[in-house]
Amino acid sequence: MFGKEDRRVEHTRRALHQALIALVREKDYDQIAVREILDRAHVSRSTFYTHFAGKDELLVSGIEGIVMTSGRGHAPTSFSLPILEHHDQHRQTGRMSRQTRIALHGRLRALIARRIREDARRSMVGIGEAPALPPDLLAQFVASTFIVVLDWWLDTRSPLSPVEMDEVFCSLVAHAVHGARTASP
């Protein structure tokens, strides 16, 4: 019974995330009502609130699903390719308003920064010396740079593939971080 229940929970959460994705392509995020998400996902209000406190929590959960499960423990840029691939799938089927993208990418930037900051702090445990770059600064820099690269890619409708954009992003970050570590104060 437990396995069957887990599948139902996963199915419900997936349906809700897909409904939200479809709706953000049709209208501004701020104008989407929970009722619209429920109708699109064929989920009851009580079921929705069993899983999420509101549409913001649903949104953050979807972003975390991509960010937090991608390449943990590797380079601070390991989240990039899965997010670019996700956007590539959706940029072929429709566009969202600039206002919605700003709202969503603000949340994405915050989640990326949190993940990088946590990973950087974990990797420094027991080292004893100050890192070349403060973890908070590195996290904010990498996350903000990613959003700039992502927005440029989407705005220009660049023909570069997700893999190529990942290489561009990683190169920008590596160059900047390496330069910061070798530059004298």
Name these PLM-found stretches.
Residues G71-R109:
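Hydrophobic alpha-helical connector segments
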Residues M1-E10, M124-G128, A180-P185:
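N-terminal intrinsically disordered/low-complexity leader segments
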Residues R91-R98, S123-G126, W153-R157:
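Secondary-structure edge/capping motif, primarily at the C-terminal ends of alpha-helices
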Residues A33-V34, G62-G71:
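Short, basic, alpha-helical segments at the C-terminal edge of helix-turn-helix-like DNA-binding modules
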Residues S78-L81, R101-G128, L133-D151, V163, ...:
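Amphipathic alpha-helical packing segments from all-alpha helical-bundle domains
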Residues M1-K27, Q31-I32, E36:
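Basic, helix-initiating cap at the start of DNA-binding domains
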Residues L23-E57:
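Helix-turn-helix
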